[in-house]
C-alpha cells in the first residue's frame, strides 16, 4: 500500500501464473491482458503470495482506459500518489467509456471546498434500475413498513449493495489508488467471477472520504521527494479541522464528510459498508469487541463475524 509499491490485502494464495511469467489471458477467460500494466503489477508487488489469478494481470480493453492511460502510471507504481482531482478525472473517463460505471457528487463540499464523489459499478441492466433497487433496500431497511412475505419478494427482486470507502485516515494512502484499479477490473473483466459480481451486486465506491487530508498528504509526500533530508512540515490536522478522529464524528455530524457518508447511507441502505483502513498486519478485520449497541439486532452483530471469518 501507499507510495512505495503494491502490497497485499490479505490474499495468501500464490498464483500459478507466476511460474510461467506474465499470463497471456485472464483466469478462465479468452480476454487479452494489458501486458505492460501486468508487468508492472508483477514487478512492484512486494511478495508473490499477494498475487492470485484475480489480480496478477490486468484485462485489456480497446474502449475503456486503464488508470495508466489517464494518470500516466499504473496503480502501485513506486513513488506515486494520486490527488483527488486526478482520481475523479479517471472515474469520469470510466463513466464516459462504459455504461457499467456511473459517477455522483456528494451533497456537500469539504471544509476545504472540494468535491466528494461516489462511483457506482454494476451491469447495465442494474444501473438502469438503480432507483428501484434503492427503493427495495430502503423498504428492507425499515421492517416496520413491510411484512415477512413482502420482505421475501423484495429480497428476491433486489441486489446486494456493497460499499467500499477509502482513506478516511489520510496517512493510510493505499485505498484511493487501489479503488481506481478495482473499478476498472469490475467494469472490464469478463471472467465468470466478475460477471457474476456485476450481475448480482451493485458496487459503490467512495474513493476518498477525507478529500482535504488526502491532498495534503500527497503534498507532503511530494515535498519529501523533492527535498531529501529536510523535515516534512508538521501537521496538527490533515483536514481543515480534524485528523485521525474524523471517524469518531458519527454522533456530532460536525464534518461534511460525515454528513455526506450518512446521506449516502440513507439513500442506498447498503448491504455491506467496507471502510478501508491500513495497519501493521497484512490483514486485520475489525468487527468490534463489544459491548455492542443494545438496539442492534444480534443477527446483525453475528453477520459482522461471518464477514470477518469469510474475509480471513
Place the predicted regions along the sequence by residue.
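A non-catalytic alpha/beta surface segment that caps or lines the substrate-entry region
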Residues: 79-126, 131
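N-terminal pre-domain segments of enzymes
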Residues: 3-84, 89
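Active-site-proximal helix/loop segments of hydrolytic enzymes
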Residues: 290-312
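Second-shell loop/turn segments in exported
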Residues: 26-30, 73-81, 165-172, 247-251, ...
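Divalent metal-coordination and catalytic microenvironments
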Residues: 44, 83, 113, 167, ...
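Surface-exposed loop and adjacent secondary-structure segments within mature catalytic domains
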Residues: 108-159, 173-182, 195-255, 260-264, ...
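Surface-exposed patches in mature extracellular/periplasmic domains of secreted proteins
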Residues: 52-57, 101-108, 192-197
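Sec/Tat-exported extracytoplasmic proteins
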Residues: 45-48, 52, 95-98, 186-190, ...
